Amino acid sequence: IGSILLFVSIVVGKTGYRFGVPTLLLFLVVGMLFGSDGLGLQFHDAKDAQFIGMVALSIILFSGGMDTKFKEIKPILGPGIVLSTVGVLLTALFTGLFIWWLSGMSWTNIYLPITTSLLLAATMSSTDSASVFAILRSQKMNLKHNLRPMLELESGSNDPMAYMLTIVLIQFIQSAGMGVGAIVGSFVIQFMVGAGAGYVLGKLAIRMLNKLNIDNQALYPILLLAFVFFTFSITDLLKGNGYLAVYIAGIMVGNNKIMHRKDIYTFMDGLTWLFQIIMFLCLGLLVNPHEMLEVAVVALLIGVFMILIGRPLSVFLCLLPFRKITMKSRLFVSWVGLRGAVPIIFATYPVVAGVEGSNIIFNICLLYTSDAADEEDS
Protein backbone atom coordinates (compact mmCIF):
# COMPACT_ATOMS: atom_id res chain seq x y z
CA ILE A 1 0.00 0.00 0.00
CA GLY A 2 2.83 2.37 0.88
CA SER A 3 4.52 1.82 -2.49
CA ILE A 4 1.23 2.53 -4.31
CA LEU A 5 0.78 5.76 -2.33
CA LEU A 6 4.31 6.90 -3.22
CA PHE A 7 3.83 6.05 -6.89
CA VAL A 8 0.46 7.82 -7.12
CA SER A 9 1.86 10.87 -5.32
CA ILE A 10 4.77 11.23 -7.75
CA VAL A 11 2.53 10.85 -10.81
CA VAL A 12 -0.07 13.29 -9.45
CA GLY A 13 2.67 15.72 -8.41
CA LYS A 14 4.18 15.70 -11.90
CA THR A 15 0.77 16.34 -13.46
CA GLY A 16 -0.05 19.10 -10.99
CA TYR A 17 3.28 20.86 -11.62
CA ARG A 18 2.38 21.27 -15.30
CA PHE A 19 -0.83 23.09 -14.39
CA GLY A 20 0.70 25.22 -11.63
CA VAL A 21 -1.02 23.34 -8.78
CA PRO A 22 1.06 23.22 -5.54
CA THR A 23 2.81 19.83 -5.60
CA LEU A 24 3.00 19.49 -1.82
CA LEU A 25 -0.72 20.20 -1.49
CA LEU A 26 -1.46 17.40 -3.97
CA PHE A 27 0.42 14.92 -1.77
CA LEU A 28 -1.92 15.90 1.06
CA VAL A 29 -4.96 15.40 -1.18
CA VAL A 30 -3.73 11.93 -2.21
CA GLY A 31 -3.54 10.97 1.47
CA MET A 32 -7.09 12.26 2.04
CA LEU A 33 -8.41 10.31 -0.98
CA PHE A 34 -6.92 7.08 0.35
CA GLY A 35 -7.99 7.81 3.96
CA SER A 36 -11.00 6.81 6.02
CA ASP A 37 -13.42 9.07 4.11
CA GLY A 38 -11.98 7.95 0.76
CA LEU A 39 -10.82 4.44 -0.08
CA GLY A 40 -10.96 3.47 3.60
CA LEU A 41 -7.30 3.23 4.61
CA GLN A 42 -7.34 3.61 8.41
CA PHE A 43 -4.75 5.81 10.13
CA HIS A 44 -5.82 7.58 13.30
CA ASP A 45 -2.68 7.76 15.45
CA ALA A 46 -1.79 11.44 15.89
CA LYS A 47 1.31 10.48 17.89
CA ASP A 48 2.73 8.45 14.98
CA ALA A 49 1.93 11.30 12.58
CA GLN A 50 3.65 13.73 14.94
CA PHE A 51 6.78 11.54 15.06
CA ILE A 52 6.88 11.21 11.26
CA GLY A 53 6.43 14.96 10.94
CA MET A 54 9.20 15.61 13.46
CA VAL A 55 11.66 13.40 11.55
CA ALA A 56 10.64 14.89 8.20
CA LEU A 57 10.86 18.49 9.42
CA SER A 58 14.32 17.86 10.90
CA ILE A 59 15.58 16.63 7.52
CA ILE A 60 13.84 19.45 5.62
CA LEU A 61 15.28 22.15 7.90
CA PHE A 62 18.78 20.67 7.82
CA SER A 63 18.68 20.40 4.03
CA GLY A 64 17.35 23.95 3.83
CA GLY A 65 20.18 25.11 6.07
CA MET A 66 22.72 23.42 3.80
CA ASP A 67 21.28 25.28 0.81
CA THR A 68 21.35 28.63 2.65
CA LYS A 69 24.52 30.46 1.65
CA PHE A 70 25.83 32.77 4.36
CA LYS A 71 27.13 35.26 1.79
CA GLU A 72 23.58 35.64 0.47
CA ILE A 73 21.84 35.99 3.83
CA LYS A 74 24.47 38.24 5.45
CA PRO A 75 23.05 41.50 3.98
CA ILE A 76 19.52 40.64 5.18
CA LEU A 77 20.42 38.87 8.44
CA GLY A 78 18.77 41.57 10.57
CA PRO A 79 15.34 41.71 8.89
CA GLY A 80 15.34 37.94 8.38
CA ILE A 81 15.83 37.21 12.08
CA VAL A 82 13.28 39.85 13.13
CA LEU A 83 10.70 38.36 10.76
CA SER A 84 11.35 34.84 12.02
CA THR A 85 10.98 35.78 15.70
CA VAL A 86 9.03 38.98 16.32
CA GLY A 87 7.08 38.44 13.09
CA VAL A 88 5.86 35.02 14.21
CA LEU A 89 4.94 36.39 17.65
CA LEU A 90 2.95 39.30 16.17
CA THR A 91 1.21 37.07 13.62
CA ALA A 92 0.16 34.68 16.39
CA LEU A 93 -1.04 37.56 18.58
CA PHE A 94 -3.09 39.33 15.89
CA THR A 95 -4.57 36.10 14.57
CA GLY A 96 -5.28 34.74 18.05
CA LEU A 97 -7.26 37.85 18.96
CA PHE A 98 -9.20 37.59 15.70
CA ILE A 99 -10.00 33.90 16.32
CA TRP A 100 -11.15 34.71 19.87
CA TRP A 101 -13.41 37.48 18.55
CA LEU A 102 -14.69 35.24 15.76
CA SER A 103 -15.43 32.26 18.01
CA GLY A 104 -17.63 34.43 20.20
CA MET A 105 -20.01 35.17 17.33
CA SER A 106 -23.43 33.52 17.56
CA TRP A 107 -23.35 32.29 13.95
CA THR A 108 -20.09 30.34 14.38
CA ASN A 109 -20.24 26.78 15.62
CA ILE A 110 -17.09 27.01 17.75
CA TYR A 111 -16.14 28.67 20.99
CA LEU A 112 -12.49 28.90 21.99
CA PRO A 113 -11.16 30.72 25.06
CA ILE A 114 -8.39 33.27 24.53
CA THR A 115 -5.58 30.83 25.40
CA THR A 116 -6.83 28.17 22.98
CA SER A 117 -7.35 30.82 20.31
CA LEU A 118 -3.73 31.92 20.72
CA LEU A 119 -2.63 28.27 20.60
CA LEU A 120 -4.46 27.76 17.30
CA ALA A 121 -2.85 30.93 15.93
CA ALA A 122 0.60 29.82 17.13
CA THR A 123 0.40 26.55 15.22
CA MET A 124 -0.30 28.50 12.02
CA SER A 125 2.07 31.42 12.60
CA SER A 126 5.18 30.28 10.72
CA THR A 127 5.81 30.18 6.99
CA ASP A 128 6.66 26.73 5.70
CA SER A 129 10.29 26.03 4.80
CA ALA A 130 9.47 23.05 2.57
CA SER A 131 7.00 25.09 0.51
CA VAL A 132 9.25 28.15 0.27
CA PHE A 133 12.36 26.20 -0.72
CA ALA A 134 10.43 24.07 -3.22
CA ILE A 135 8.48 26.88 -4.91
CA LEU A 136 11.16 29.58 -5.03
CA ARG A 137 13.69 27.17 -6.51
CA SER A 138 11.50 25.05 -8.77
CA GLN A 139 9.95 28.16 -10.32
CA LYS A 140 13.46 29.72 -10.70
CA MET A 141 12.23 33.15 -9.66
CA ASN A 142 14.63 35.98 -10.40
CA LEU A 143 13.93 38.09 -7.32
CA LYS A 144 15.75 41.36 -6.69
CA HIS A 145 16.83 43.13 -3.47
CA ASN A 146 17.89 39.86 -1.76
CA LEU A 147 14.25 38.79 -1.43
CA ARG A 148 14.89 35.09 -2.06
CA PRO A 149 17.51 34.67 0.71
CA MET A 150 15.35 36.78 3.05
CA LEU A 151 12.30 34.56 2.50
CA GLU A 152 14.36 31.38 2.79
CA LEU A 153 16.06 32.57 5.98
CA GLU A 154 12.70 33.53 7.47
CA SER A 155 11.01 30.26 6.55
CA GLY A 156 13.94 28.14 7.68
CA SER A 157 14.32 29.85 11.05
CA ASN A 158 10.73 30.73 12.03
CA ASP A 159 9.48 27.16 12.56
CA PRO A 160 11.43 26.95 15.86
CA MET A 161 9.67 30.10 17.11
CA ALA A 162 6.23 28.76 16.19
CA TYR A 163 7.12 25.45 17.83
CA MET A 164 8.15 27.20 21.06
CA LEU A 165 4.96 29.27 21.12
CA THR A 166 2.90 26.11 20.62
CA ILE A 167 4.66 24.16 23.39
CA VAL A 168 4.60 27.07 25.87
CA LEU A 169 0.88 27.70 25.29
CA ILE A 170 0.09 23.98 25.74
CA GLN A 171 2.03 24.04 29.04
CA PHE A 172 0.25 27.26 30.06
CA ILE A 173 -3.19 25.75 29.39
CA GLN A 174 -2.44 22.45 31.14
CA SER A 175 -0.81 24.04 34.20
CA ALA A 176 -3.63 26.58 34.63
CA GLY A 177 -1.19 29.42 34.08
CA MET A 178 2.58 29.96 34.00
CA GLY A 179 4.46 32.92 35.36
CA VAL A 180 5.99 35.47 32.99
CA GLY A 181 9.43 34.54 34.29
CA ALA A 182 8.90 30.87 33.48
CA ILE A 183 7.69 31.69 29.96
CA VAL A 184 10.61 34.03 29.22
CA GLY A 185 13.05 31.55 30.75
CA SER A 186 11.71 28.74 28.57
CA PHE A 187 12.16 30.85 25.42
CA VAL A 188 15.70 31.91 26.37
CA ILE A 189 16.81 28.37 27.21
CA GLN A 190 15.36 26.91 24.02
CA PHE A 191 16.97 29.60 21.85
CA MET A 192 20.37 29.58 23.57
CA VAL A 193 20.70 25.80 23.81
CA GLY A 194 19.33 25.28 20.28
CA ALA A 195 21.64 27.84 18.68
CA GLY A 196 24.67 26.71 20.68
CA ALA A 197 24.09 23.01 20.02
CA GLY A 198 23.52 23.65 16.32
CA TYR A 199 26.80 25.57 16.01
CA VAL A 200 28.93 23.12 18.02
CA LEU A 201 27.45 19.95 16.51
CA GLY A 202 27.60 21.47 13.02
CA LYS A 203 31.34 22.05 13.51
CA LEU A 204 31.70 18.50 14.82
CA ALA A 205 29.85 17.10 11.79
CA ILE A 206 32.22 18.96 9.43
CA ARG A 207 35.24 17.60 11.28
CA MET A 208 33.93 14.03 11.20
CA LEU A 209 33.08 14.18 7.49
CA ASN A 210 36.56 15.46 6.64
CA LYS A 211 38.61 13.39 9.09
CA LEU A 212 36.93 9.98 9.05
CA ASN A 213 38.44 7.85 6.32
CA ILE A 214 35.55 5.62 5.21
CA ASP A 215 36.33 3.23 2.36
CA ASN A 216 32.78 3.26 1.03
CA GLN A 217 31.95 6.88 0.08
CA ALA A 218 28.23 6.04 -0.07
CA LEU A 219 28.30 5.93 3.74
CA TYR A 220 29.20 9.63 4.11
CA PRO A 221 25.62 10.87 3.46
CA ILE A 222 24.29 8.24 5.87
CA LEU A 223 26.79 9.41 8.49
CA LEU A 224 25.51 12.96 8.07
CA LEU A 225 21.89 11.78 8.34
CA ALA A 226 22.71 10.06 11.63
CA PHE A 227 24.24 13.34 12.77
CA VAL A 228 21.03 15.22 11.94
CA PHE A 229 19.00 12.90 14.16
CA PHE A 230 21.65 13.06 16.89
CA THR A 231 21.66 16.86 16.80
CA PHE A 232 17.88 17.06 17.18
CA SER A 233 17.73 14.40 19.90
CA ILE A 234 20.57 15.68 22.10
CA THR A 235 19.32 19.28 21.81
CA ASP A 236 15.80 18.23 22.78
CA LEU A 237 17.24 16.24 25.69
CA LEU A 238 19.03 19.39 26.88
CA LYS A 239 15.70 21.31 26.75
CA GLY A 240 16.80 23.24 23.67
CA ASN A 241 15.02 23.77 20.37
CA GLY A 242 15.91 20.83 18.14
CA TYR A 243 14.50 22.42 14.98
CA LEU A 244 16.67 25.51 15.43
CA ALA A 245 19.70 23.31 16.12
CA VAL A 246 19.38 21.23 12.94
CA TYR A 247 18.83 24.36 10.81
CA ILE A 248 21.96 26.06 12.19
CA ALA A 249 23.93 22.82 11.87
CA GLY A 250 22.81 22.64 8.23
CA ILE A 251 24.05 26.19 7.62
CA MET A 252 27.41 25.28 9.17
CA VAL A 253 27.82 22.17 7.01
CA GLY A 254 26.63 23.89 3.83
CA ASN A 255 29.00 26.84 4.19
CA ASN A 256 32.19 24.86 4.81
CA LYS A 257 34.31 22.51 2.73
CA ILE A 258 33.28 18.89 3.20
CA MET A 259 34.25 15.61 1.57
CA HIS A 260 31.94 14.20 -1.13
CA ARG A 261 29.81 17.35 -1.21
CA LYS A 262 28.05 16.43 -4.46
CA ASP A 263 27.04 12.95 -3.24
CA ILE A 264 25.81 14.36 0.07
CA TYR A 265 23.72 17.09 -1.58
CA THR A 266 22.15 14.61 -4.03
CA PHE A 267 21.32 12.21 -1.18
CA MET A 268 19.83 14.93 1.04
CA ASP A 269 17.78 16.42 -1.79
CA GLY A 270 16.21 13.06 -2.64
CA LEU A 271 15.64 12.26 1.03
CA THR A 272 14.00 15.64 1.60
CA TRP A 273 11.50 15.02 -1.19
CA LEU A 274 10.81 11.48 0.04
CA PHE A 275 10.02 12.67 3.56
CA GLN A 276 7.94 15.57 2.29
CA ILE A 277 5.79 13.07 0.39
CA ILE A 278 5.55 10.72 3.39
CA MET A 279 4.76 13.60 5.74
CA PHE A 280 1.96 15.03 3.60
CA LEU A 281 0.54 11.56 2.89
CA CYS A 282 0.39 10.66 6.59
CA LEU A 283 -1.23 13.96 7.51
CA GLY A 284 -3.74 13.48 4.70
CA LEU A 285 -4.55 9.97 5.94
CA LEU A 286 -5.02 11.30 9.47
CA VAL A 287 -7.70 13.74 8.37
CA ASN A 288 -11.44 13.05 8.24
CA PRO A 289 -12.72 15.46 5.54
CA HIS A 290 -16.33 15.30 6.78
CA GLU A 291 -15.21 16.79 10.12
CA MET A 292 -13.54 19.69 8.33
CA LEU A 293 -16.82 20.79 6.78
CA GLU A 294 -18.06 21.81 10.24
CA VAL A 295 -15.32 24.45 10.54
CA ALA A 296 -14.90 25.30 6.85
CA VAL A 297 -16.32 28.84 7.06
CA VAL A 298 -14.31 29.71 10.18
CA ALA A 299 -11.10 28.31 8.65
CA LEU A 300 -11.68 30.30 5.47
CA LEU A 301 -12.19 33.55 7.41
CA ILE A 302 -9.05 32.92 9.47
CA GLY A 303 -7.10 32.24 6.28
CA VAL A 304 -8.34 35.45 4.66
CA PHE A 305 -7.48 37.44 7.80
CA MET A 306 -3.94 36.04 8.00
CA ILE A 307 -3.24 36.60 4.30
CA LEU A 308 -4.76 40.08 4.02
CA ILE A 309 -4.24 41.54 7.51
CA GLY A 310 -2.28 39.40 9.99
CA ARG A 311 0.78 38.60 7.89
CA PRO A 312 1.08 42.01 6.13
CA LEU A 313 0.63 43.94 9.40
CA SER A 314 3.30 41.83 11.13
CA VAL A 315 5.73 42.19 8.21
CA PHE A 316 5.32 45.97 7.96
CA LEU A 317 5.81 46.43 11.72
CA CYS A 318 8.90 44.19 11.71
CA LEU A 319 10.48 45.94 8.72
CA LEU A 320 9.87 49.50 9.96
CA PRO A 321 13.47 49.89 11.25
CA PHE A 322 14.92 48.72 7.91
CA ARG A 323 14.36 51.77 5.72
CA LYS A 324 16.42 50.47 2.79
CA ILE A 325 13.81 47.80 2.04
CA THR A 326 11.50 49.16 -0.67
CA MET A 327 7.71 49.27 -0.43
CA LYS A 328 7.41 46.72 -3.28
CA SER A 329 9.71 44.35 -1.39
CA ARG A 330 7.65 44.74 1.79
CA LEU A 331 4.46 43.98 -0.11
CA PHE A 332 6.03 40.92 -1.75
CA VAL A 333 7.30 39.55 1.57
CA SER A 334 3.85 40.18 3.07
CA TRP A 335 2.17 38.19 0.32
CA VAL A 336 4.61 35.27 0.11
CA GLY A 337 3.83 33.75 3.48
CA LEU A 338 3.78 30.24 2.02
CA ARG A 339 2.19 27.57 4.19
CA GLY A 340 2.64 23.83 4.09
CA ALA A 341 2.53 20.86 6.45
CA VAL A 342 4.24 22.56 9.41
CA PRO A 343 1.02 24.05 10.89
CA ILE A 344 -0.61 20.61 10.64
CA ILE A 345 2.40 18.98 12.32
CA PHE A 346 2.30 21.52 15.14
CA ALA A 347 -1.48 21.02 15.39
CA THR A 348 -0.86 17.38 16.34
CA TYR A 349 0.83 18.52 19.57
CA PRO A 350 -2.42 19.76 21.20
CA VAL A 351 -4.13 16.55 20.02
CA VAL A 352 -1.46 14.32 21.58
CA ALA A 353 -1.45 16.48 24.74
CA GLY A 354 -5.23 16.16 25.04
CA VAL A 355 -5.93 19.90 25.03
CA GLU A 356 -9.65 20.71 24.97
CA GLY A 357 -10.68 21.77 21.46
CA SER A 358 -7.62 20.13 19.87
CA ASN A 359 -9.69 18.45 17.12
CA ILE A 360 -11.04 21.85 16.09
CA ILE A 361 -7.46 23.20 16.03
CA PHE A 362 -6.30 20.32 13.83
CA ASN A 363 -9.15 20.59 11.32
CA ILE A 364 -8.89 24.38 11.03
CA CYS A 365 -5.12 24.12 10.53
CA LEU A 366 -5.56 21.64 7.70
CA LEU A 367 -8.21 23.70 5.93
CA TYR A 368 -6.27 26.92 6.44
CA THR A 369 -3.07 25.37 5.08
CA SER A 370 -4.89 24.10 2.00
CA ASP A 371 -6.53 27.48 1.32
CA ALA A 372 -3.37 29.50 1.98
CA ALA A 373 -1.15 27.28 -0.17
CA ASP A 374 -3.61 27.42 -3.05
CA GLU A 375 -4.15 31.21 -2.89
CA GLU A 376 -0.47 32.11 -2.50
CA ASP A 377 0.70 29.77 -5.24
CA SER A 378 -1.81 31.28 -7.66
Identify the residue ranges that each predicted region occupies.
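Transmembrane helical cores of multi-pass secondary ion antiporters/exchangers
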Residues: 1-371, 378
